[in-house]
């Protein structure tokens, strides 16, 4: 099994193969990807769809001298396997294993780290211009999906690239008509019309030579969705940007891909190759439902993904989705917005029930936030469902377009804190720090499912921009209460009181997901625990009361320590005039790698045992140094 694949330790081995061996290699590679992902979990549909394209690129171009940048990066498993990491695939996305995304520190073939979308053309253009300036003769290639092409950054890069007439730049549009959620908007409709223009590529002067080696475009067009008879295809958007447009060609046909790429290799200036692929190619279950198989956990390939037979705890994403539907039923002003994450953000049911108030704006976080601001000015109640890591992309809009005008937009921030197997690129580590400094913002962190629901309801009642952060995955098992209860603004609650005598009293000020492990640590240490709830406005009265009745204060958050929730507590303490030693616990001043979420928390000292250990070493051991006012541990 895998007789050909076992001979490939790097692309140089691939380039030594006879052309006739490449399709059998593709079959082995696809089977290997399926087998690997079924054992580790990970992205599947997208990787099954890029097998032939990956082989063709490494076969034609002299990698790593020629640079390949993979947009988003979750479709790079075939690339990793062909570039020396075949025998490490069992560790994919595991603790201390290889990353699920390109990483420069992992391989010289990973020329640019990616994970967020629409960055590849900018990076590849920079490489192409850099190579020119250095006098190097190499191609720089960006592989970008049709979903990622809806983001403005991709077109900013193309606008810049189009005037670089001598750059050896190739942009490959991997057109599978499928981002995580179906691509939306006028641009996608334009691409669909372009793709369905049956005689377009053959008729274009200057492209006939490149395409002459490929099967007739007419044959490919029969596989594509046809539009109304007699439709006139508009001039391509890509040529208007100064690119030489080539295609579309079948992205699963090596006899089309390889000679086309060989011809492109001889050209100069920006080239744009349009390839049509199918997500899940070669595995019928994934072909039929590429969303379900986009990022599965472990499963049996022979049986496919089966529903769990054991009752699962409700996820925070499900809590949000149910809350949004309930609020929309009560109030016709509620509008839901997602930047291309309908399934991931829990908005499938909302779209079905409230289609006229559901807006998927595509991979356009900046637009999503300002669009929400515009809705708010008209008296509507916009709710932006967004991952913490993607809100970073709309920071200026958050400040300039929403907070500065004090517009009542609700930000439902999913995937806050560490995110496990997706790693540092997707971690929600910074939202508390970067939002806390913005005037007019209210920020809450949920400690359980019902508190999340009630916080979201509270946020919807506020006259200013308000954020509720909650983590990825299942909650604590707390049942949600159907009736809504508004949480008093800026008020935390004490969940446990110490019985220790004076001189040993420790108060733990916990935020969001850190309430549960803090309670576990408190049981061991007999400490007080406060569920702070609000990061802004922080409960200054509670901070003062705890400082006055305890000897030591500890803040705990699943976010970066620098500038985060703990810093808000220290600032409140300084304002109170009460001096107490403070220990701040949170994520370290470094990027936390991928792996099991529980293991990563333990690594950061943020599980119950780690919190107790830090407190004991800092305050309660005979050698403890409690001099000074505050100390950060991360």
UniProtKB/Swiss-Prot annotation:
Gene it is expressed from: dxs
Organism: Burkholderia orbicola (strain MC0-3)
GO CC terms, sorted: cytosol
Co-factor binding details: Binds 1 Mg(2+) ion per subunit. Binds 1 thiamine pyrophosphate per subunit.
GO molecular function, one term: magnesium ion binding
UniProt keyword annotation of Zinc present: no
HAMAP family xrefs: DXP_synth
List of residues binding Mg(2+): 146, 176
Keyword set includes Metal-binding: yes
Reactions catalysed: D-glyceraldehyde 3-phosphate + pyruvate + H(+) = 1-deoxy-D-xylulose 5-phosphate + CO2
Cross-referenced InterPro entries: Dxylulose-5-P_synthase (IPR005477), THDP-binding (IPR029061), Transketo_C/PFOR_II (IPR009014), Transketolase-like_Pyr-bd (IPR005475), Transketolase_BS (IPR020826), Transketolase_C (IPR033248), Transketolase_CS (IPR049557)
Function as written in the Swiss-Prot or TrEMBL entry: Catalyzes the acyloin condensation reaction between C atoms 2 and 3 of pyruvate and glyceraldehyde 3-phosphate to yield 1-deoxy-D-xylulose-5-phosphate (DXP).
UniProt similarity note: Belongs to the transketolase family. DXPS subfamily.
Record keywords: Isoprene biosynthesis, Magnesium, Metal-binding, Thiamine biosynthesis, Thiamine pyrophosphate, Transferase
Positions with a binding annotation for thiamine diphosphate: 74, 115-117, 147-148, 176, 283, 365
Any GO BP annotation: 1-deoxy-D-xylulose 5-phosphate biosynthetic process
Named cofactor requirement(s): Mg(2+); thiamine diphosphate
Pathway: Metabolic intermediate biosynthesis; 1-deoxy-D-xylulose 5-phosphate biosynthesis; 1-deoxy-D-xylulose 5-phosphate from D-glyceraldehyde 3-phosphate and pyruvate: step 1/1
UniProt xrefs under PROSITE patterns: TRANSKETOLASE_1, TRANSKETOLASE_2
EC top class named in words: transferase
Oligomer and partners: Homodimer.
Protein name per the record: 1-deoxy-D-xylulose-5-phosphate synthase
Enzyme Commission code: 2.2.1.7
């Amino acid at each position: 099994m895998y007789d050909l694949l076992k001979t490939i330790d790097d692309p140089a081995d691939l380039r030594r193969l006879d052309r006739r061996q490449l399709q059998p290699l593709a079959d082995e590679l696809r089977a290997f990807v399926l087998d690997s992902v079924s054992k580790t979990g990970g992205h599947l549909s997208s990787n099954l769809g890029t097998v032939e394209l990956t082989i063709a690129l490494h076969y034609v171009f002299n990698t790593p001298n020629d640079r390949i940048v993979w947009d988003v990066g979750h479709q790079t498993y075939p690339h990793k396997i062909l570039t020396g990491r075949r025998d490490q695939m069992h560790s994919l996305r595991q603790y201390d294993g290889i990353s699920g995304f390109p990483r420069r520190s992992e391989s010289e073939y990973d020329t640019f780290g990616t994970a967020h979308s629409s960055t590849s053309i900018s990076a590849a253009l920079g490489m192409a211009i850099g190579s020119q300036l250095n006098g190097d003769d190499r191609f720089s290639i960006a592989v970008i999906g049709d979903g990622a092409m809806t983001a403005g950054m991709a077109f900013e890069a193309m606008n810049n690239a189009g005037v670089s007439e001598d750059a050896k730049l190739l942009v490959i549009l991997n057109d599978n008509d499928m981002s995580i959620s179906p691509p939306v908007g006028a641009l996608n409709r334009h691409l669909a019309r372009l793709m369905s223009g049956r005689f377009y590529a053959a008729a274009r002067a200057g492209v006939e030579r490149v395409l002459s080696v490929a099967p007739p475009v007419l044959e490919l067009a029969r596989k594509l969705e046809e539009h109304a008879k007699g439709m006139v295809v508009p001039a391509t958007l890509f040529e208007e940007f100064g690119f030489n447009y080539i295609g579309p060609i079948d992205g699963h046909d090596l006899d089309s891909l390889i000679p086309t790429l060989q011809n492109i290799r001889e050209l100069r200036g920006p080239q744009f190759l349009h390839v049509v692929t199918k997500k899940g190619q070669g595995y019928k279950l994934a072909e039929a439902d590429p969303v379900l198989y986009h990022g599965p956990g472990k499963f049996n390939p022979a049986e496919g993904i089966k529903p769990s037979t054991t009752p699962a705890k409700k996820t925070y994403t499900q809590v949000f989705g149910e809350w949004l539907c309930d609020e929309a039923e009560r109030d016709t002003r509620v509008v839901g917005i997602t930047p291309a994450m309908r399934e991931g953000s829990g908005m499938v049911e909302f779209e079905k029930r409230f289609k006229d108030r559901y807006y998927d704006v595509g991979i356009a976080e900046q637009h999503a936030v300002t669009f929400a601001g515009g809705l708010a000015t008209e008296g509507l109640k916009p709710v932006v469902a967004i991952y913490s890591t993607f809100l970073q992309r709309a920071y200026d809009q958050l400040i300039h377009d929403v907070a500065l005008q004090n517009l009542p937009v609700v930000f439902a921030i999913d995937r806050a804190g560490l995110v496990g197997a997706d790693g540092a690129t997707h971690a929600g580590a910074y939202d508390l720090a970067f939002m806390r400094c913005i005037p007019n913002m209210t920020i809450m962190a949920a400690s359980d499912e019902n508190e999340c629901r009630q916080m979201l309801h509270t946020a919807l009642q506020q006259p200013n921009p308000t954020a509720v952060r909650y983590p990825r995955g299942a909650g604590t098992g707390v049942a949600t209460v159907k009736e809504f209860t508004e949480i008093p603004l800026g008020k935390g609650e004490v969940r446990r009181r110490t019985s220790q005598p004076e001189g040993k009293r420790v108060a733990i000020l916990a935020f969001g997901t850190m309430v549960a492990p803090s309670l576990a640590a408190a049981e061991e240490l007999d400490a007080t625990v406060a569920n702070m709830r609000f990061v802004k406005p922080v409960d200054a009265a509670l901070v003062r009361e705890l400082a006055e009745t305890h000897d030591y204060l500890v803040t705990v958050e699943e976010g970066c320590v620098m500038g985060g929730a703990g810093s808000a507590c220290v600032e409140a303490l300084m304002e109170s005039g009460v001096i107490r030693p403070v220990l701040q616990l949170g994520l370290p001043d470094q990027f936390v790698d991928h792996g099991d979420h529980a293991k990563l928390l333990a690594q950061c000292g943020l599980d119950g045992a780690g919190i107790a250990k830090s407190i004991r070493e800092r305050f309660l051991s005979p050698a403890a140094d409690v001099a000074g006012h505050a100390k950060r541990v991360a």
